[in-house]
Swiss-Prot record:
This is Putative pre-16S rRNA nuclease. Could be a nuclease involved in processing of the 5'-end of pre-16S rRNA. SMART domains: YqgFc. It is an enzyme of class 3 (hydrolase). GO terms for cellular component: cytosol. One of its GO terms (molecular function) is nuclease activity. It comes from Haemophilus ducreyi (strain 35000HP / ATCC 700724). It is found in: Cytoplasm. It holds the Pfam family RuvX. Belongs to the YqgF nuclease family.
Length: 138
């Protein structure tokens, strides 16, 4: 049975979003939500959840390279808990180390320096988080 999954790249100013299917194990970038100090416009997130009707939400967990937590880690956990509480959907956390670096590299290779826009980086990062989740959950 196909499962639709939405992934989020949490940030204090922008939250990238991507969608994917368990059958194809591919992700497609959707949008980046503006946030103020990590607080998103919940109505925008609700709209995308209603549109895609996901079975699962995945939130990228920012960790240091050695696997230890950083200040943003707890904020991402809080965001994940709020998603679960508001929308009553299961939420999984996925290690997101190096996704922003990989996203920048991918965007730069396609369009050079001028293509490196923050919202594009965040949505590609959300895709990479979801693809990583697929790789770890066959």
């Amino acid at each position: 049975m196909a499962t639709t999954i939405l992934a989020f790249d949490f940030g204090t100013y922008s939250i990238g979003c991507a969608v994917g299917q368990s059958i194809t194990k591919t992700a497609q970038s959707l949008t980046a939500f503006k946030s103020q100090d990590g607080i998103p416009n919940w109505q925008h997130i609700e709209k995308i959840i209603k549109e895609w009707q996901p079975d699962l939400l995945v939130v990228g967990l920012p960790l240091n390279m050695d696997g230890s937590e950083q200040p943003l880690t707890q904020r991402a956990r809080k965001f994940a808990n709020r998603l679960n509480g508001r929308f009553n959907l299961p939420v999984a956390l996925q290690d997101e180390r190096l996704t922003t670096t990989e996203a920048k590299s991918e965007i730069f290779s396609r369009g050079g320096y001028k293509a490196l826009k923050k919202d594009k980086i965040d949505t590609i990062s959300a895709c990479l988080i979801l693809e990583s989740w697929f790789d770890n959950n066959p």
